[in-house]
Amino acid sequence: MNLPVREFDAVVIGAGGAGMRAALQISQMGLSCALLSKVFPTRSHTVSAQGGITVALGNTHEDNWEWHMYDTVKGSDYIGDQDAIEYMCKTGPEAVLELEHMGLPFSRLDDGSIYQRPFGGQSRNFGGEQAARTAAAADRTGHALLHTLYQQNLKNHTTIFSEWYALDLVKNQDGAVMGCTAICIETGEVVYFKARATVLATGGAGRIYQSTTNAHINTGDGVGMALRAGVPVQDMEMWQFHPTGIAGAGVLVTEGCRGEGGYLLNKHGERFMERYAPNAKDLAGRDVVARSIMIEIREGRGCDGPWGPHAKLKLDHLGKDVLESRLPGILELSRTFAHVDPVKEPIPVIPTCHYMMGGIPTKVTGQVLAVNEQGEDVVIPGLFAVGEIACVSVHGANRLGGNSLLDLIVFGRSAGMHLQESLEEQGATRDASNSDIEASLDRLNRWNSTRSGEDPVEIRKALQACMQHNFSVFREGDAMAKGLEELKVIRERLKNARLDDTSNDFNTQRIECLELDNLMETAYATAVSANFRTESRGAHSRFDYPDRDDDKWLCHTLYQPQTESMTRRKVNMQPKLRPAFPPKVRTY
């Protein structure tokens, strides 16, 4: 098959915060850059980020990037890489002020400086009193970020391909990534995007679960592409369940609500977080708050409702003026999806899948890593990853609120800054052959030639139910082993699924089938990884192994796609500018 070819210095797959920040930096460096997105860029899932960007600006009180680093390392349950966390926290203020200069409309304090609100897990002076570190644009920070970055990419002549779906990476005979193939959703045209640098910025994969804050586009496309290219994925057992999704809908209710003074109640009207986190209370780490809500429900203190047992988030005491000025989006979402007015009554909430802490292992420069037979990190030529799809790892076993947007802009920026230098170090590479390119079309050809078999919608439902029931907030060995066996059966069913719609123009069923392949890859890697880690750490909480085991598990886990087996990778405990923070018991 002779495909049309579009050639660029770099191709960025995904136009959320990380992808657009990387593309902007690449274009500003004078390189030609294609930005591929399966939706219009400002509809990327970053648009739903509400609370803000956590960064030590010191606008509301004295602050220090080292305090931010301490909180992030502690929040990660000590498997966040401290060199990467140091880089993110140290570089963060500069990266955020760049956004301000681009025109991002932050909320303001009375003196005109950027407004910062308290978020969970934040402290002053290495674990002291509560900090207010999260820079916000009301409760629509992600929306403001995407529109700002989109405008800047237009200004800097990034070539944007909206509603193009990346199929798979193209690797040459030497193992270097030489771009990708993609299909135009509007016309069905398939094109080879040739580039010496390919940046995966495809976001999360929360749609492997039944209940998630993630948009329908979050289907783990980058995970699937990486695994099929033989790239390992790291810490895939670590999925954050946000404490406050709207019960019955899964729609996110930002942690900023609790930062502004909201608090959780059980059916007896008790502020139950005082029992689980006496100091931080409702602003403890997200894994702590999510588990606390589920314990209240398991022990019979959950609130009753048509959506099942849940907790209540009380905001009405803050007053109408505060809610309308600082949390206008939450008022709208609550009235639409929960049918309650937070000015008058609490919001029904329950933990729901929110964020993938694991992903593709990378350097601070965004270069994707594998591990050789000697256990050493090696760079995969031509491949980069940034944002939620990447595992730098700054989040470890539990992400702090507001650090996701900081991750996007700091490491999207870093990948763009170092991309040309990385390619120069890589040297000359041979072009991909026709057979290399055709190999990336195998999935598309399989779906296009399948007219009989099982309905992929039913397979997707079965996958999501399996993950929700066996790999949720609390986990247990027998249930996870059973869940893995169920996934093996579902994976076999997927091989015999059918594509009914054979049209070319806006064939959304074809895209959904291709997405289902990626959901399956992501779910399977998650299940194998979760069975492997026999301890409780951060978001990975096991009834049969309730304690953290630093002797055995102070490490990353790596899922190897070729053998579907697990290995370990060392956590980086060597920051460059200050001593490392040693592991301690996490208390809030």
UniProtKB/Swiss-Prot annotation:
Database matches in InterPro entries: FAD-dep_OxRdtase_2_FAD-bd, FAD/NAD-bd_sf, FRD_SDH_FAD_BS, Fum_R/Succ_DH_flav-like_C_sf, Fum_Rdtase/Succ_DH_flav-like_C, SdhA/FrdA/AprA, Succ_DH/fumarate_Rdtase_cat_sf, Succ_DH_flav_su_fwd
Location of the protein in the cell: Cell inner membrane
Gene Ontology CC entries for this record: plasma membrane
Metabolic or biological pathway: Carbohydrate metabolism; tricarboxylic acid cycle; fumarate from succinate (bacterial route): step 1/1
UniProt keyword list: Cell inner membrane, Cell membrane, Electron transport, FAD, Flavoprotein, Membrane, Oxidoreductase, Transport, Tricarboxylic acid cycle
PROSITE patterns: FRD_SDH_FAD_BINDING
Cofactor-binding details, from the entry: Flavinylated by SdhE, flavinylation occurs at a very low level in the absence of SdhE.
Catalyzed reactions per annotation: a quinone + succinate = fumarate + a quinol
Gene3D superfamilies attached to this UniProt entry: FAD/NAD(P)-binding domain, Fumarate reductase/succinate dehydrogenase flavoprotein-like, C-terminal domain, succinate dehydrogenase protein domain, Succinate dehydrogenase/fumarate reductase flavoprotein, catalytic domain
Family statement: Belongs to the FAD-dependent oxidoreductase 2 family. FRD/SDH subfamily.
Record text on subunit structure and interactions: Makes weak or transient interactions with SdhA. Part of an enzyme complex containing four subunits: a flavoprotein, an iron-sulfur, cytochrome b-556, and a hydrophobic anchor protein. The complex forms trimers.
Protein name: Succinate dehydrogenase flavoprotein subunit
Organism: Serratia sp. (strain ATCC 39006)
